[in-house]
Amino acid sequence: MKTKMIKPAQPLRNLLKVSFFAVSTIALSGLGSLSVQADETCMSPYMAKIVGQEDFVYVWTLGMEGVGDEQDKLVTVDVNPKSASYGKVINTLSVGGRNEAHHSGFTDDRHYLWAGGLDTNKIFIFDVHTNPAKPKLTKVITDFVAKSGGVVGPHTTYALPGRMMITGLSNNKDHGGRTGLVEYTNEGEYVSTYWTPTDSNLQGAVKTGNYADGYGYDVRVLPRRNLMLTSSFTGWSNYMMDFGKMLNDQEAMKRFGNTVVQWDLHARKPKKVLDVPGAPLEIRCAWGANNNYCFTSTALTSKIWLIYEDKEGAWQAKAVADIGEPSKIPLPVDISISSDDKMLWVNTFMDGKTRGFDISDPFNPKQIYEEKIGAQVNMVSSSWDGKRLYYTSSLLANWDKKGTDNEQFFKLYHWDGKALKQQFAIDFIKEKLGRAHQMRFGAYSLYAANLPVQQSVLAKHP
């Protein structure tokens, strides 16, 4: 008797796919001879996290005048120390022109990487599962502004079940910081726009302090608390301006966000506007099941802020630590939290340093380490086991330093709990690549059927 296969509904199929890859990866980990998935610790909780060695880092890279083909590109670096091409660029995929390549993020099933351009508002969708060593561009969204109703500057591309939530930085009316969130399906179809609350339109949210500016930047969620948080930066008129010119423009310096917004995750509605003055950027949430808090850092005031749930179940914001010497404006940029919620890595662009903070007590972070990474540094990504930290250099094309200080690199360091030790560095200018920005990890073990022959299970376990 033949059994008839019944095709499950799409949501169930998505769940089954995620479960299959999780189980496959766990099974591979038991073999001992294969790498299993490692993950950058600041990804969506809707994606499984498994300890192990990552095989690749995908670097979303800005094209640079006079360097190579001058186009934005996705650069794939081999980071598996057992590989013959360890520490080398093994693939590049140019997308045409300069779009102000910035951030990228996987879909929940990790099959596709979405990467945005802050200037052209294009979103490039790469297939990273068919051949993880050689991503393929499968779709370009070119009508983001029109579909969203005027949102400009697609920044964070963040995985929800079957969906991608995209934060905007600006709008097409005044190119200031007023903006919103834009939701798409994993297939790249527009769903809805959610505008960030302002003084003139709070949309039912409670304003708790002095600000309700409507600005946007990053997004993170804690599903168990039905929480979505967004932070705030600045609009197109600022982020596309020369950095020195902007610093000397008093009006421009007033156009920065000062808020973190609490949203109802499931209803997609704003609930509360928290004052976090000084341009709060990346949001990083704790992983512990009972750790109901997240961190952000403020670029202009050089502080670590804790966004936490109090004893009454209300969400609050509190400045808990200084970063370097705030009076010198070190310009905090990217941050990365360890998977055990004990360390927070904070990069500062102006002095090129990374700082490690002990956050065992989230209300009292203590700096325990610092290291100069380069003349400038922006992004940091930590492996799930906390042993590897990756760094890149570029902030924005018009904000990067000039002359010899305009170093463009991708670097790997090992962390032994006491010190960072550099393992390798790739000069993105020497390699004719451009300005290195966002990093995302890849691994063969996510897609067991696609393991190269020399790493196949049967070959090693007859």
Language-model features and meaning:
Residues 39-79, 86-118:
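Beta-strand-rich domains and repeat architectures in extracellular enzymes and scaffolds
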Residues 52-69, 167-178, 231-255, 392-410:
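Short, conserved, GDST-rich strand-edge loop motifs in beta-rich repeat architectures
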Residues 53-55, 109-111, 161-163, 224-226, ...:
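Short coil/turn segments that connect the beta-strands within blades of beta-propeller domains
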Residues 86-156:
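Blade-loop segments of beta-propeller domains
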Residues 88-100, 138-150, 193-214, 270-279, ...:
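Surface-exposed loop and turn segments in beta-propeller and other repeat-based domains
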Residues 107, 209-354:
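Beta-propeller domains
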Residues 128-222:
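Asp-box/WD-like beta-propeller blade repeats and closely related beta-sheet repeat scaffolds
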Residues 302, 326-406:
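Loop/turn-rich, solvent-exposed surfaces of beta-rich toroidal or solenoidal domains
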